[in-house]
Amino acid sequence: CKLGDDGSDVAVRLGDRIIRYRLNVPGRHWVQNSLAVLGTVSALGGDPDRAAAALADLTAPKGRGARVNVQTPAGLLTVIDDSYNASPASMRAAFAVLGNTRPQSGGRRIAVLGDMLELGAKSAQQHAALAGDLEANRIDQVFCAGPDMAALDNVLPTAMRGGKATDSKSLAPQVCNAVTAGDVVLVKGSLGSRMALIVDALRALETNDGLE
């Protein structure tokens, strides 16, 4: 498997055959999902070659890793909209995707993160534990929305702290004022964190309607 910033080239052995196919969505987790699909198709007696070919048409849906190019007055930036849901595992998978995405010249890798909800008594610890993964994936700046994400902000290196707020609506202006041409911006959080508001604010920069 060869992972790229815009997708993956996969070769899998099924019995005595090797099937090669292209996924046009980036991330190891998408590769793992595709392997499960091919295994299921094969087990049910279907045609894994046809299934592999169909996987080339797969696109990440809105809120689940869809990429949006935003042409701002300053230049182009890329938004990775992963705002629909979040867990510790899916956060780490998203960081890996961001880490494998090369910003344009002068750009940065930016993570804008909202609370992961329903984690119980150890929620703060699980949020703080994401710091090492952010550093390992060479994320340049991190913005945090929500009381649980404040625990992450508290343990980040000073140079990585982009800003924090109590909720996504309050954080949106900070993010919009910070992004520059060439940046790749991941927006992720549980649905209840309403991180889609920040995606919308970033998209509005294209028409100069961003938040003041």
Q: What label would you give each PLM region?
A:
Residues 11-13:
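A general beta-strand register signal
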Residues 1-3:
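Residue-level recognition of beta-strand microenvironments
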Residues 5-6, 16-20, 24-29, 35-212:
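ATP-dependent carboxylate-amine ligase
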